[in-house]
Amino acid sequence: MAKNDKINFSTPSGFPEFLPSEKRLELYLLDTIRRVYESYGFTPIETPAVERLEVLQAKGNQGDNIIYGLEPILPPNRQAEKDKSGDTGSEARALKFDQTVPLAAYIARHLNDLTFPFARYQMDVVFRGERAKDGRFRQFRQCDIDVVGREKLSLLYDAQMPAIITEIFEAVNIGDFVIRINNRKVLTGFFQSLNISETQIKSCISIIDNLEKIGEAKVKLELEKEGINPEQTQKIIDFVKIDGSVDDVLDKLKHLSQTLPESEQFNLGVSELETVITGVRNLGVPDKRFCIDLAIARGLNYYTGTVYETTLIGHEALGSICSGGRYEELVGTFIGEKMPGVGISIGLTRLISRLLKAGILNTLPPTPAQVVVVNMQDELMPTYLKVSQQLRQAGLNVITNFEKRQLGKQFQAADKQGIRFCVIIGADEAAAQKSSLKDLQSGEQVEVALADLAEEIKRRLT
């Protein structure tokens, strides 16, 4: 590199990095999510960031996602090794774009080592060639859970998902939210009753999934472009706009099933939906936390039954903050047997970005430390180290200032980091086994015996 060449240290577009205050918020949310996942018996796994490209693209799983391929970058004197790197053809590698396809590959690799139903959680970073813009990232963390069965999987696992979503978002206190539930069989069965072809049904579901985003008028235009006639289009719009309480919607669907021709798929979907709703209620989820929304379709083609989207009440423009559903064939296609599954995903990076911008969440102080032991004189460092260790052993997070600076500057540095307490020990205090405890939050300063220091700080923290 020439002397005058300057390195561009800006992050690549779409690849976020966090200040300590932001990273601590992410860790807090990750810990909360993990605790809830584990309370339901989900076990952690980790899959490689890199998968074989043929795995990621198998059975059309790539969808519309742009995959980041990997190719080794060799120094000029090693270019001859490039053809031997094994990164072409079936050995081509790429970064994973979600965690569902890698889960399917993971189960295929470890089928005989796992117990089914297999309930796992994974909170990893994934990569997509998204158009980088506000709230959209090319690298982001997803917090996923899935339950996968062999041959069959109880619908009560579907019912468990809203209970888990409710516990997580109530724990992080982000305000009122609602989990919108539907069943793809209800939609498919209704479209079949209108004599819409299977190929058209897939397109219709994707279009309906965008109803909230693009509006009714554009949905009608898109449906008509797919060859849906005006009468069918209006019936579809009227159907997905059915609303009311959960019981009202179920009653309307049951009544409708009596009038629909070829309604076997529709009836099965309504029955599954009712089973899931009953399970959600039995798990103690309040009715205010969920509803049936017939416009929720989840555009991904691998969903076959229950689908979910979660929105913040009053902040619907933020979009879904947690979504998922049931799939019958996604995992099984890798293995050659029926392996139904159900899961949800929280796109944590995007969620944090949106909630911070909306003022719904605030960052945490940049350090977990609650206490600073200030440096009054270097000769007392043995005392400072001993006191710091005693406070840590009592369960407090402590920084010891090893460099001596003006006391005011030490206070300023502690306050800037959001640290509440400063422990001040001069020669006289050390001789008397006492300290001055300064509360930077209130400005109060009190004398405390060293033997009582930990308990006094903990008392003030509660």
UniProtKB/Swiss-Prot annotation:
PROSITE patterns: AA_TRNA_LIGASE_II. GO terms for biological process: histidyl-tRNA aminoacylation. Transmembrane segments: none annotated. Keywords: Aminoacyl-tRNA synthetase, ATP-binding, Cytoplasm, Ligase, Nucleotide-binding, Protein biosynthesis. One of its GO terms (molecular function) is histidine-tRNA ligase activity. GO terms for cellular component: cytoplasm. Gene3D superfamilies: Anticodon-binding domain, Bira Bifunctional Protein, Domain 2. It comes from the Bacteria. InterPro entries: aa-tRNA-synth_II (IPR006195), aa-tRNA-synth_II/BPL/LPL (IPR045864), Anticodon-bd (IPR004154), Anticodon-bd_dom_sf (IPR036621), His-tRNA-ligase (IPR015807), HisRS-like_core (IPR041715), HisRS/HisZ (IPR004516), HisRS_anticodon (IPR033656). It catalyses: tRNA(His) + L-histidine + ATP = L-histidyl-tRNA(His) + AMP + diphosphate + H(+). It holds the Pfam family HGTP_anticodon. It is found in: Cytoplasm. Its EC number is 6.1.1.21. PANTHER family: HISTIDINE--TRNA LIGASE, HISTIDYL-TRNA SYNTHETASE. Homodimer. Belongs to the class-II aminoacyl-tRNA synthetase family. HAMAP family: His_tRNA_synth. This is Histidine--tRNA ligase. It comes from Nostoc sp. (strain PCC 7120 / SAG 25.82 / UTEX 2576). The lineage of its organism: Bacteria, Bacillati, Cyanobacteriota, Cyanophyceae, Nostocales. The gene is hisS.
